């Protein structure tokens, strides 16, 4: 039986979505620079005839695959939005208006109004920042190694909080809020380790991304912010940072179970619906 798959070729990761023999939605993931591994996997799936591809590296991957498969290309955000709406339905959410923050290598932020979407903005701070700073500061360069170390890290000896500045005096804002990411590293002899550094890097990224998302949500009076992206996958520390900051500003954070695969899911759905 001929089959179709969806591929989201991102700056760091390439995600694949397909239906297995039992018609269950299934995912594969590769580093985008491991194109040989991607092609080897595809060759083993002998039933694949059509690929819908999206993402920043879609053109590059398409050139390698076009002789062997029928290729359908889809705009990156259209694919992501189709995937997000599918997951929202599967997880029983009934939300039509929201801010969508996609934390990939960098971060992009969109307003969603029913079936319309507008790009609000973005930042170069994202998953690539986490990995780049992790490599520079600790020489750890694999995401799978960063996550468990982050879980046991603490930011108290590296970040300056509002409470640190006011020193017990009543402050105008919450004492636990960060006044300066990594600020203590330059001012005092701190007792910190690699886990603490990694936790603080994630704190910096999480707070920057959340602050931008909150500004956009407040501007449009939107209550819900959906955070997606592979950077959040199994990354409870980052999710907690984003969640607490979002709730502090009276907005509702939502993390979708397969949010990191939204683009690949959307590409798959686009191709299968078009085919049918």
UniProtKB/Swiss-Prot annotation:
Enzyme Commission number(s) of this protein: 2.7.1.33
Pathway: Cofactor biosynthesis; coenzyme A biosynthesis; CoA from (R)-pantothenate: step 1/5
Substrates-to-products reaction catalysed: (R)-pantothenate + ATP = (R)-4'-phosphopantothenate + ADP + H(+)
GO terms for MF: ATP binding; pantothenate kinase activity
Complex and partners: Homodimer.
Task of the protein: Catalyzes the phosphorylation of pantothenate (Pan), the first step in CoA biosynthesis.
Family: Belongs to the type II pantothenate kinase family.
Keywords: ATP-binding, Coenzyme A biosynthesis, Cytoplasm, Kinase, Nucleotide-binding, Transferase
GO CC terms of this entry: cytosol
Active site, UniProt feature: 76
Signal peptide as annotated in the record: none
Protein location: Cytoplasm
Gene: coaW
PANTHER family documented for this protein: 4'-PHOSPHOPANTETHEINE PHOSPHATASE, PANTOTHENATE KINASE
Name listed for the protein in its UniProt record: Type II pantothenate kinase
Lineage: Bacteria, Bacillati, Bacillota, Bacilli, Bacillales
InterPro entries listed in its UniProt record: ATPase_NBD (IPR043129), Type_II_PanK (IPR004567), Type_II_PanK_bac (IPR011602)
Matches recorded under Pfam families: Fumble
Main location per the UniProt record: cytoplasm
GO process annotations (BP): coenzyme A biosynthetic process
Binding site residues for ATP: 8-15, 105, 127-131, 143, 230
């Amino acid at each position: 039986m001929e089959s179709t798959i969806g591929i989201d070729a991102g700056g760091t990761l390439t995600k694949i979505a397909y239906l297995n023999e039992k018609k269950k939605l299934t995912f594969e993931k590769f580093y985008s620079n491991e194109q040989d591994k991607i092609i080897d996997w595809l060759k083993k799936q002998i039933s694949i005839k059509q690929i819908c591809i999206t993402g920043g590296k879609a053109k590059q991957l398409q050139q390698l695959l076009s002789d062997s498969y029928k290729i359908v290309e889809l705009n990156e955000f259209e694919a992501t939005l189709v995937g997000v709406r599918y997951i929202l339905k599967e997880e029983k959410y009934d939300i039509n208006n929201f801010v969508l923050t996609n934390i990939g290598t960098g971060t992009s932020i969109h307003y969603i109004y029913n079936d319309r979407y507008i790009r609000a903005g973005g930042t170069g701070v994202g998953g690539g920042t986490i990995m780049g700073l992790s490599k520079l500061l600790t020489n750890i360069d694999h995401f799978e190694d960063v996550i468990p170390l982050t879980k046991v890290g603490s930011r108290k000896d590296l970040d300056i909080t509002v409470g640190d500045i006011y020193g017990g005096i009543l402050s105008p804002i919450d004492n636990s809020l960060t006044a300066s990411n990594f600020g203590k590293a330059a001012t005092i002899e701190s007792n910190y380790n690699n886990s603490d550094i990694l936790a603080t890097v994630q704190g910096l990224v999480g707070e920057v991304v959340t602050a931008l998302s909150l500004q956009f949500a407040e501007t449009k009076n939107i209550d819900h912010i959906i955070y997606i992206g592979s950077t959040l996958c199994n990354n409870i520390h980052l999710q907690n940072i984003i969640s607490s900051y979002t709730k502090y500003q009276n907005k509702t954070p939502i993390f979708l179970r397969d949010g990191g695969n939204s683009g690949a899911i959307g590409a798959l759905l686009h191709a299968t619906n078009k085919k049918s």
